[in-house]
A protein has these predicted regions:
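Glycine-rich N-terminal loop/short-helix segment of MobA-like nucleotidyltransferase
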Residues: 15-25
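Substrate-recognition element of Asp-dependent hydrolases with the DxDx(T/V) motif
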Residues: 48
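Active-site-adjacent betaalpha module
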Residues: 2-8, 13-17, 30-45, 57-218
């Protein structure tokens, strides 16, 4: 039996993914289409979708009004902080298990990478893993249940890259690591995509595309 995939969708929120968003990222529409195509093609093998979510207060240090470099975005409970409707509704329609991981809710911390505080990888049975992670503020805990990870989202040169870095640096005390695959056409970047491509190359990460992806052998 094949292992299920954990699909991690980083910060695909309306302030980033919509053209009228507070911090709209070019290429988000193309990335959305690729993610939707991937989910439809691999739905039976996707055990869960984890949405990471920027969840700032109006006082967050990253905002220009507070001395940061970004316009205010993804403010808690605002429309712009909402997860992209089309992807969310597809997961609901297909009955895919969804989890949401809040980050960036500590006003004093710029939290690009979602999983900086990962716990122990626990083996359950012969081929099943349970990995826990906390956010920086320790008020959100999540467990993802597969060592086969496909990651995509916004923005490739910031939150996606740093979240990948969190995942690939982790090794359990017994030497277990995660099988991280990058859904490149499901990523939108503030730059032209060079940063995420070079990062994947430097770290020998498998790059996949929605149109050609075939589920890895179990």
């Amino acid at each position: 039996m094949k292992k299920k995939i954990t699909l991690i969708i980083v910060d695909f929120q309306k302030d980033f993914s919509n053209v009228i968003g507070k911090l709209s990222v070019k290429g988000a529409d193309k990335a959305r289409k690729a993610i939707i195509a991937f989910i439809k093609k691999n739905a039976e093998f996707i055990g869960e979708v984890i949405f990471t979510v920027d969840w700032h207060t109006a006082n967050h240090c990253s905002f220009k009004s507070n001395g940061g470099i970004w316009p205010a975005h993804c403010v808690q409970y605002s429309e712009g902080a909402g997860v992209d409707d089309k992807i969310l509704h597809l997961c609901i329609e297909l009955g895919i298990n969804m989890k949401f991981f809040i980050k960036g809710n500590d006003d004093s911390v710029e939290e690009y990478g979602a999983f900086e505080k990962m716990g122990t990888i626990m083996t359950i049975g012969n081929d099943h893993y349970s990995i826990s992670a906390n956010n920086h503020k320790n008020d959100c805990n999540i467990t993802f249940e597969s060592d086969k990870v496909v990651i995509c989202g916004i923005a490739g040169d910031y939150c996606v890259k740093n979240t990948i870095a969190n995942l690939i640096k982790y090794k359990s005390p017994t030497g277990l690591t995660l099988d991280v695959n990058v859904l490149l056409d499901g990523i939108a970047s503030i730059d032209d995509g060079t940063t995420i491509k070079e990062y994947c190359k430097e770290n020998s990460l498998p790059i996949v595309e929605a149109k050609e992806y075939k589920y890895l052998k179990g």
